[in-house]
Amino acid sequence: MKIGVIGYGHRISSVIKEVMKADVDCQIAAIVDIRKDAVKAQLDEQGWHHIHYYDTPEQMFAAEQLNGVMIGTRCNLHTTMGLKVLQHNLPLYIEKPVATNYEDLLRLKQGYEASTSPVVVSFPLRVTSLVELVKEIVQSGKIGTVEHVQAINNVPYGRVYFQSWYRNEEETGGLFLQKATHDFDYIQAVLGQTPVSVCAMTSKQIFKGNKSAGLKCVDCEDNRICLESTVGTVEGLDPTWQYCCYAEDTGNEDSGSALFRYESGMHMSYSQNFFIRKGAAARGARFMGYKGTVDFDFYTGQVKVHMHHTARVETYDLAAGSNHFGGDAKLARNFTEVMKKKASSISTLDDGLMSALMCMKAQESAQTGTFQSLKWE
């Protein structure tokens, strides 16, 4: 099974490893990357001498007979590169978010509808053992129909969104698209309901300031006293997290919340935070019905069912796992099966489009102070 890669970044490289673990028949046949010489040197050291390298997707498609394509470019190129693959009707694995603006989202939707490509979107949380157990409990009717959802994501490594390239909102599309997209997707996977409107709010209270644009920690006069300084740190931070998070060009909100109304009349609340640290980390949700409540947290690896009319609480302890809590391995295996026509996608582009639409409408609501309808317009 020959796979082409467009954009060989850190994230997609880890997914590729999972794909090759899942199926020994899979191999990377070709890579398109603006850093192709550096990527070639890196992979040659690993003994991957068989790979062909190209400057453009068009060159790759003209020269290679591929069984599938994986896209790992920066976020603002996901749509453009995705459309190139869809035109060839090849199986596609695409990173989230599938688009970073509404125009691209519509283009991708139209391209998908005109293509026969099966698509797997990188939404690993929906296929973790935790979420699958919650979905099983909800679908059993044990807690009754879900009539309210409360979800949170308190991110302990939030500095990456203010000190690395993620701080550029033009590339990322903002933090609803970067983080909430995962959460909105797993909530949708559990609920199976249609959201119709949203109101949202964001704040930037911590990571703002008047330090000069482009300032790096190493060049800052406060780098020995600043709590966010990467100079002399003992935490082993990624060396690319080098920019000042208090500079005037630091993008992204540091907290955000959204309320979604569904067709049934129920609503879901979601809140995310990017300046908490250490033990304050939390990521999960509560699904509430009249009979009971089921809640879970990815960091603890626990699922709890609280019955409302009996003195009973059920607790399930599951290993949280690594690589998005084990979800990456499941998606990788699914992609290999999709390429071999043995299975359908368990994380479709329809799912990716809906999650992106929810994020974009939440962002628009926060920017305009208005309710937004979740319609394709």
Regions found by a protein language model. Give the residues of each.
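Residues that mark the start of a beta-strand
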Residues: 2-4, 145-148, 267
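Contiguous beta-strand/loop segments that form the cofactor/metal-binding neighborhood of enzyme cores
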Residues: 178, 182-300, 331-337
